[in-house]
Amino acid sequence: MKPVIALVGRPNVGKSTLFNRLTRSRDALVADLPGLTRDRHYGEGRVGERPYLVVDTGGFEPVAKDGILHEMARQTRQAVEEADVVVFIVDGRNGLAPQDKSIADYLRKTGRPIFLVVNKAEGMKYTAVATDFYELGLGDPRAISAAHGDGVTDMINEALEVAYAGQPEEAEEDDPSRGIKIAIVGRPNVGKSTLVNALIGEDRVIAFDMPGTTRDSIYVDFERNGKKYTLIDTAGLRRRGKVFEAIEKFSVVKTLQSISDANVVILLLDAQQDISDQDAHIAGFVVEQGRALVIGVNKWDGFDDHARDRAKADLTRKLKFLDFAKSHFISAAKKTGIGALMRSVDDAYAAAMSKLPTPKLTRALIEAVEFQQPRRRGPVRPKLRYAHQGGQNPPIIVIHGNALDAVTETYKRYLENRFRETFSLTGTPLRIEFRSSNNPYADKG
């Protein structure tokens, strides 16, 4: 599982600036659950080969009793509970504030590793910046400038050393005797627990828990029709006797972790509710992570033809970017449609792990170009010469040629569709990379 780093501090100390620098993006996944008055932002960062999730919390007022500040404090506490490391940010220009002391008092009691970070320290001597903050009793302050990047790399490297040291051994997760790793994700109350119980109970398979992180990640191994599968961190489901039930707290962090760890993701939607921005955000993270995907539309039973047509149209319109994934209309409660859903899981996994021979890829590329050439950009027309596979899960196709920076997104999409059709790559994202020759004359004509 990717470790989680939570950014905590009072308002306006630079948490969002640091978040944007760590994730190298201004785009963030947002938890827009009903009733939340201030969203937490989630993103992914990476240092070398070490990925991590980072949470940008709202301004923290631990003693707030009601209203928006109370709600923001509640959400921050949840983020701290889910974090492997907490980065506590204070303002070096404005100095120590009473709220900083209240936050420090709370954080000391959590038992989480705390990194005290003094932001906005550019142009200031370390001793002048840090002295006041020793009073918080959280060890040596680390001076940074989130806006300029000063000190950020060293700080995050130290934080990741601690975060990864606390991660469980992954030998169990990577055991080759295990089957396809599946994450079932979706909003609260879409029927995840019902689907899990339908899957593990249908063949009278004994399911068992395998402890993961200290925050109760679950691994459930089961067989179906002679095939092995593993449900990984069922994200909001906990064992109650012989069945799984939804718990009261929906965790976006656990959802993102389970997506990252999966081979195939089942995105479960509720046919009786409109597709929300949150559904689209979760789906977008699946694609960003390159995970194979199957869509399950639950609670389908009882719909008349008109309602079904409307639900299908809503799915096509709002999740158009998932057109590579198969959709299944199911009833987890009545166990209808689940067989076809699982067959698509198998197909999506097979597609994600496909081996694409260079001669066949190049032949498919040439046929695609002969059928429709890329457009010129000024005097230059891109020349696509040959292709080979650059990776699996998701499949990566590397195309070599000349002037390939002139290839449009529309033409790239055309090539993707041609490759999907030729190699039956349904259910998996597909990456296409272009590598141009340095010959400035080879692309003329």
Curated annotation (Swiss-Prot):
Record's function text: GTPase that plays an essential role in the late steps of ribosome biogenesis.
Keyword Repeat belongs to the record: yes
Disulfide bonds: none
Domain KH-like: 354-438
Recorded superkingdom: Bacteria
Residues given in the record as GTP 2 binding sites: 186-193, 233-237, 298-301
UniProt keywords, alphabetically: GTP-binding, Nucleotide-binding, Repeat, Ribosome biogenesis
GO biological process: ribosome biogenesis
Limits of the EngA-type G domain: 3-167, 180-353
Protein name, UniProt field: GTPase Der
Subunit-structure text: Associates with the 50S ribosomal subunit.
Cross-referenced SMART domains: AAA (SM00382)
Family of the protein in this entry: Belongs to the TRAFAC class TrmE-Era-EngA-EngB-Septin-like GTPase superfamily. EngA (Der) GTPase family.
Keyword Repeat on entry: yes
GO molecular function: ATP hydrolysis activity; GTP binding; ribosome binding
InterPro entries (UniProt xref): AAA+_ATPase (IPR003593), G_ENGA (IPR031166), GTP-bd (IPR006073), GTPase_Der (IPR016484), KH_dom-like (IPR032859), KH_dom-like_a/b (IPR015946), P-loop_NTPase (IPR027417), Small_GTP-bd (IPR005225)
Binding site for GTP 1: 9-16, 56-60, 119-122
Pfam families: KH_dom-like, MMR_HSR1
